[in-house]
Structure formats: structure tokens, C-alpha cells
Amino acid sequence: MNTCGKLIAVEGIDGSGKQTQVRLLSQALESRSLQVLSTGFPQYNSWFGKMVGQFLNGDFGPHHDPHFTALLYAGDRFECKGPIVAALEQGQIVITDRYVASNLAHQTARSSPEKREEFRAWIEHLEYGIYGLPEENLVLYLRVPPIQAQSLVAKKSVRAYTDSAHDILESDLRHLQAAADIYDRLARRPNWKTIECYDPRSDSMRAPGDIAREVLAAVQPLVPVLQEKR
């Protein structure tokens, strides 16, 4: 798929501050007169997204094949493919809070360990091959230890898809650890940049502004105008 824009995905386990960094990065780019489309997944108001919300709320029960849920998440992105591709073709910078890697990390973590590599390839073929979703130019991985991330999730405001402080994945620390391990492996890819968001010396999250400066520095090679002196 030929595009002239750039696609930047902000990834990380729940509670890593993705939404905040998408907002700050969008503001930083727009302040430099760049056209930006910011979005995020799941889109809980889409046809597939509503089913994702039901899954996360536990409406489908505790046990289901991860192929089923991977299809839901991929379908949610497919429903939003049009605006993303259009923005890229117009030369815009698309920044998304979660993208394909979230499916790879969270759903692969729910599969049996001996089949995880095969399942990862299956998801990538589904999203990039079957659905034709554009591939990321850059993935920003906001890395946070699962135990700290889980406590941060509990501080979130009430979300539309669940009345609980944690959805069924957020409440499972073993799942979060497995997903974090998969993210760590994915982060070895050349188009990924890992940003450590937790400071073990202070036993707390780094300030959002400090993280945002590191995020912007990681984006600079992708967007030449950011390298110009102001």
C-alpha cells in the first residue's frame, strides 16, 4: 500500500499512559503546523468494538478461543481502515493508541506457549494481509512493570464498557505479565522504540512531560521538520 504519510502506534500494557502520550505527541506535532489524525483502539462504538467491550466485561464467559477475540480486535481496526488510509495518502501523521501489536501481545498471551509464534504470524496475516491494514512506520513501546501498571488501571475513571475497576484482562496479573513479555520480544524489531516509563529509583512513574520529550525525540527521524531549528 503506497502512502506518503506516517503511521505511529503507541503501545504498552494497560496503565502505561498511552492515551496521555498520544495527546501530547499530537499537540507537539500540530504546534509545528503538521496535519495529525489521532485515534485509538478498541473503538467501542463500532460494530466489532461493541463486541470487544462485551468480551472485556466478561459477557462471553471466562473461556473462549483467542482466535475469536483476535478476530474481534482485528475487525474493529478494519472498520476504521478507510479514514486511516485516507489520512496517510494525504500526507498526514496518524497516531494511534494501540494498533496491531496490542492484538499480538494480548491475544498471543492467551494462547498455549508452544503455539504462540504460529498464532502471532496468524494475527499478522489477518490484520496486514487479509484486512490490508497499513503497517506502522514507528511503534513507541511505553514499558511499565505489570504490577505497577495494574495499580494505575485501578485509578482510571469509569469506562463505558464495564462498571468494574479492571476488565477481565486487566484483573489477571499473569496475563499482563505474559503480554508484557511478548511486547518485550516484539520491541526487538527495527521499527520499535522502547521508552521506560517507570523509575525504579523513585518507585513511581516518570513525569508525563519527561516521557513526552523522549517520545518526540524518537519521532524526529521520521518527521524531518522536527529536526529543523526553531
Label the model's feature ranges:
Residues 26, 147-230:
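NTP-dependent small-molecule kinase module
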